[in-house]
């Protein structure tokens, strides 16, 4: 009987877990729809910003060569210092979502160290911060709350210090890493070089835009201000994209957990029925044996 009670208690425990994971899946599904929509609109907006920036940069470049004046285009042959901004979630229970980002960052650190390049980490998200703190790795800056509740202001604060350090020569390169949303069932790691910028990526060929303007003096300042906005929005988009991917990963993880719990309940029910049958058989044998002994 004690064995039956243990199995019944396990069944109830797994069923309670199943209810929790099912509820979390529904919550993640609802949040994913909202985050997916935000990511889609942000992607369109980011493409438009890039288009406008390219057009303005092209026209400015017709008046003066701003590339040589802007520090954002200062590509060094021998890089000595690199800043990596990486985004993870503030919460867990999202499968390998955070692990993939952390693995990518660790691999990048190893590659840079092999080339004698110093790496500084700027961590966005509680899970990434906790991991590297546990590993005893120094973090230059930490940001909690930006990945779970992204805003443009938070993105500005994160990217500003890194860009300032690049402009002031404290670091030679800034890289942004996050796990991005691909579709409802998959995510992909995205690694983007923020600065320095390859001139051909911004100042390329003239677009078909009908925009006409004649820039004022100080062309470099105009372009630098535009690029600063571009950097800020790149950071903001990575936060939104990461959040959508996080909800997608959590929805999957909770769906898998719910299915596993369902399968476990089936196994425990079989074990319970088998144990109950054995118990009944034993009782019948005891009754029959008792009757036989009385004859």
Curated annotation (Swiss-Prot):
Role description: Produces ATP from ADP in the presence of a proton gradient across the membrane. The gamma chain is believed to be important in regulating ATPase activity and the flow of protons through the CF(0) complex.
UniProt topology in membrane: Peripheral membrane protein
Compartment(s): Cell inner membrane
Protein name (database record): ATP synthase gamma chain
PANTHER family: ATP SYNTHASE GAMMA CHAIN, ATP SYNTHASE SUBUNIT GAMMA, MITOCHONDRIAL
GO cellular component: plasma membrane; proton-transporting ATP synthase complex
One of the protein's GO biological processes: proton motive force-driven plasma membrane ATP synthesis
């Amino acid at each position: 009987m004690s064995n039956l009670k243990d199995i019944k208690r396990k069944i109830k425990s797994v069923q309670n877990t199943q209810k929790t994971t099912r509820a979390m899946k529904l919550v993640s599904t609802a949040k994913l729809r909202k985050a997916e929509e935000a990511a889609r609109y942000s992607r369109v907006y980011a493409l438009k910003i890039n288009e406008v920036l390219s057009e303005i940069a092209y026209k400015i470049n017709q008046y003066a060569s701003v590339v040589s004046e802007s520090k954002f285009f200062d590509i060094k042959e021998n890089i000595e210092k690199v800043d990596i901004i990486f985004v993870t979630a503030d919460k867990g229970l999202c499968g390998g979502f955070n692990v993939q980002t952390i693995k990518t960052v660790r691999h990048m650190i190893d590659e840079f160290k092999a080339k004698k390049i110093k790496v500084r980490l700027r961590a966005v998200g509680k899970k990434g911060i906790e991991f590297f703190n546990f590993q005893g790795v120094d973090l230059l800056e930490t940001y909690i709350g930006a990945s779970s509740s992204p805003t443009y202001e938070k993105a500005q604060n994160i990217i500003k210090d890194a860009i300032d350090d690049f402009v002031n020569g404290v670091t030679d390169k800034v890289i942004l890493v996050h796990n991005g949303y691909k579709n409802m069932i998959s995510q992909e790691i995205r690694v983007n070089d923020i600065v320095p910028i390859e001139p051909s990526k911004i100042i390329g060929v003239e677009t078909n835009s009908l925009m006409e303007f004649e820039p004022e003096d100080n062309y470099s300042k105009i372009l630098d201000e535009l690029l600063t906005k571009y950097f800020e929005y790149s950071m903001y988009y990575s936060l939104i994209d990461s959040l959508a991917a996080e909800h997608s990963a959590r929805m999957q993880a909770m769906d898998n957990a719910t299915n596993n719990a369902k399968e476990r309940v089936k196994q425990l029910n079989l074990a319970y029925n088998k144990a109950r049958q054995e118990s009944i058989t034993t009782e019948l044998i005891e009754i029959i044996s008792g009757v036989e002994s009385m004859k």
